[in-house]
Amino acid sequence: MKTIVLKLGGEIVHSPELDLVARDLRTLVDGWNRVAIVHGGGPQATALQKRLGLETRMVAGRRFTDEATLEVMKYVVAGRLNVDLCGRLLANGVMPVGLHGASGHAIQATRRPPRVMQGAGPEPVDLGLVGDVVGFNLPLLGDLFERRYVPVLACLGCDDAGQALNINGDTVASQLAGALRADALVLVTSTPGVLRDVKDPSSRIPRITRAEFERLVADGTISGGMIPKLEESFEVLRGGARSVVILGKLAPGDLEAALLEPGSAGTVLVAD
């Protein structure tokens, strides 16, 4: 039996790829594996903000969250996307349970204090109603796993006073994988893994160690937004997870293959 945390980007939730993920998930759950899903909703939140005439303010790649933005995130992430995702999973034979931070305090958080952020200048930045994960309701998740349910967590945390807080989905998934000491954290993205040439899907790198990652950054093969994503992924390995898989542009069976035969699909990150 393995413990798997699956992170789905908002762009995946309404794509045909989700059905491929769901079918592989059913096979994994039928094999008594414990699976938890974390999802974001950035693209959908930005689209709704535009429709409502609200400004989307990004600071060093992070969404500034005021009261109006938090209301959008509640509607989009904890509402529509969570319901739609659970519905698609249910249609494919998976038994999901939709959760967010206020659901049994599933995602416990505190408001992030102002801090200096790379790419945002020397002064501390206040991101507003943004949270840092401080824990999870692991007994609740354990009970769901025992009954072969799949927890589906929207990336909204909640503090002890009941205040909802926006949290980056990759961060929630990474922290959850560490807390569960997961066998694998799988990041399902819009790319088929880490590529030597971003324009050539066939240049996928099957396996990367920490030392190899540092070499690939130094020679420019890995750059831009992929650097912090992989940095955080390697921190997950230090925190107790056994492997991280970056996967996308899925074909039937890719998720199951990536877990059963690491490196056969996507890119697997390992500590050494």
UniProtKB/Swiss-Prot annotation:
InterPro entries: AceGlu_kinase-like_sf, AcgluKinase_fam, ArgB, Asp/Glu/Uridylate_kinase. Pathway: Amino-acid biosynthesis; L-arginine biosynthesis; N(2)-acetyl-L-ornithine from L-glutamate: step 2/4. One of its GO terms (cellular component) is cytoplasm. It holds the Pfam family AA_kinase. Signal peptide: none annotated. Belongs to the acetylglutamate kinase family. ArgB subfamily. This is Acetylglutamate kinase. The lineage of its organism: Bacteria, Pseudomonadati, Myxococcota, Myxococcia, Myxococcales. The gene is argB.
